[in-house]
Amino acid sequence: MSLYNNIFDAHAHYDDKWFDDDRFELLENIHTKGVCGIVNNAVDLEMPLIVHDREAHGDVYDLLRKYKPNALVHCFSGSVELMREAVRMGMYISLGGVVTFKNARHSLEVASEIPLDRLLLETDAPYMAPVPFRGKRCDSSMIIYAAEKIASLRNISISELLQITCDNAKQFYNIDD
């Protein structure tokens, strides 16, 4: 890999010199550099960054620690400890229909403990429809189910939770009234 580490070459006659592991490493390197570029651009342009870190918490958080963007972790799937780290870095956490699932222990713990000024709601449409719509196509009208569950966990009214998360969204996206 060292001969070709700094280039992406499409010459087919080199094909016999590459092994599957080398190709995987090259593609992973290209992907990582692309993601770094996106994160860096968000920081340089002072734009909000929406991050989906599914099955890549360690790598993603390494990048976020390095670049320190204004970030929202979309469809958060991590532990309470990971949520706390994200909050310490000033990030927002977005939760959706998963909090209505019976087996969503991590999401319920996060929903119970996240500082309310760091919480956003989402649907992740067309996926992750909340109970009672599991297995169906999710849409934005279903966000209320996540809001009801989180409000119940936090012992606050749904309208209060919706106001808080609306204010948080305005803050994150830099929207003036």
What are these regions (language model features)?
Residues 1-177:
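Mid-domain alpha/beta scaffold segments of enzyme catalytic cores
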